[in-house]
Amino acid sequence: MRKTLLVICGIACVTGLHAQDVERTQDGAKNFIRTQNVTEEIRFYSDDIVRVIKYPSRHLPDKKSYPVIKTPEDVNLSYTEQEGNLSIKTGNMEVVMDKNSGKITFKDVQGNLLVQEKEFGTNFIPCKDGPYDSYRVSQRFMMSPDETLYGLGQQQTGKLNQRDQELTLRNENTRVCIPYITSEKGYGIYWDNPSPTVFSDTPQETSFNSEVGYMSDYYFIYKDGTQDGVIAGIRDLTGQATMLPLWTMGYWQCRERYKSPDELCEVLDKHRELGVPLDGIVQDWQYWGCDSNWNAMKFMNPRYINKMGDEAWMKYLPNGEDPNAKYPEPRIKTPKEMVEYVHKNNAHLMISVWASFGPWTDQYKELDAMNALLKFETWPRNAGVHPYDPFNPKARDLYWRYLKNLYDLGIDAWWTDSTEPDRFDMGEREFSLPTADGTFRSVHNAFPLLSNQGVYEHQRAVSDSKRLFLMTRSSYFGQQRYGSFCWSGDISSQWDVMRKQIAGGLNYSLCGIPYWNTDIGGFFGWEYNNNWKDVAMQELQVRWMQWGCFMPIMRNHCSSPMESEIYKFGEEGYWAYDA
């Protein structure tokens, strides 16, 4: 009898310990799981959005979220406890916490299963992040076997359904990596960790596994079982998509690169002569000159300022160009004249600016003095060019201070290139380089968000009467709030590559970011020897152009020596031109 009483008392004490460790909070619940030494919190941001965080201690780590700008609302929560579970309901969803294992289950208000964590599916493995102690953090879920998943940004696999694969989510040219998935069931999960992350889906589990982090941190979004509802939740959580200027919705012509103001304006003239609508034209790189002067944000190339032959300016001639070449007397002699000519002819001008600087530039020298350069190899290689640190607010201030010179010149739109940023020969030292917010590794995928944020916020501070238009090569969750559209990077001119962009663009858009496009015709024309007279190349260009009509932004582009203006493919009456 005495032993029986002791056992009963022991069970009561253990049950009591678990009960004491589960706390109902103003916005959800908090649970300390003794067997795992893990604290988990459920925090409702609205009826549609709930945040789940877990960390291996009793003390909440300090963590910044770059995409999330919403503050939690007051949500009417209904609590129910039974059989070791705590159920919390809002008007749109039910979240169930297993108080012993910490497993979280998500249901709709009718009690139908949406998705659930795998039991004991949160893992923390101690590791080093440069000089800091950190963890490899993973979270595993269990999806329905026949469920389709979308999202993950813009990949180059050609897969629309993201099941049955493993992907390393680390931004690079042609791959935009967003740790967000959305289901045909009408829910979305955003894994809030910007370090390189492996997404894996097998018949047994679906998981996110990040290189470094101090907590498992994700947001579950569910409204009415539709993608409209999920995307509304994304915009509520991370910011509304800005309205782009009306003129951005027309046709854009771009080439790598127009090599003088006359060359750019002659392309505009030809479109006007042919009666082909053209709303925008793009000035690509090297208007600043040579690689050492990379991204000076000034017109210093002597061909742009009528200084060919002037010894003081010839040192800025782009690498590989002939200093003895003879050119006719320019019709348009200054950048200001070029901008005014474009505007006079009812078009708009976009210009290329990068997230890196050459050692001759004033920006490089100032950023170096404030330890705001990331000193790893980037494009162009072997030129001493380095990316800046957009996580440093003072570096973003400096970036705009120089960019404003081009804004004051009348430039209409920004091509913020290489916002991954480009990187080569990366090892432990390079990924461990410090930023203002920790190691480069720990914040890597958020680089494009912060870099575009700097341009957007500074220009809006100067004038809120002019809408922004930023074309950028990389992106992150929430980037729709910064007036930017992403293109799919420097892809090659091939049918299979074109096909892959379709799935990439759809999955990117399902991450809540509506503005996206490709280089119409592809960037690298190697497959056809950069020959626009090749009939096979013309066929590809025509089909891509037809698809381009349905992209959010219609922009023709190619790499030198290819030329892709439509009149290069023939005259009126020739099938490729007429199509």
Can you say where each PLM-predicted feature lies in the sequence?
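Catalytic-domain carbohydrate-binding cleft regions of carbohydrate-active enzymes
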Residues: 112-579
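Bacterial Sec-dependent N-terminal signal peptides
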Residues: 1-22
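A low-complexity, Ser/Thr/Gly/Pro-enriched, surface-exposed linker/loop concept
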Residues: 21-22, 28, 43-87, 125-127
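Hydrophobic or amphipathic alpha-helical targeting/insertion segments
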Residues: 89-116
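Broad, structure-driven detector of short, well-ordered beta-strand segments within folded domains
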Residues: 40-44, 93-99, 189-191
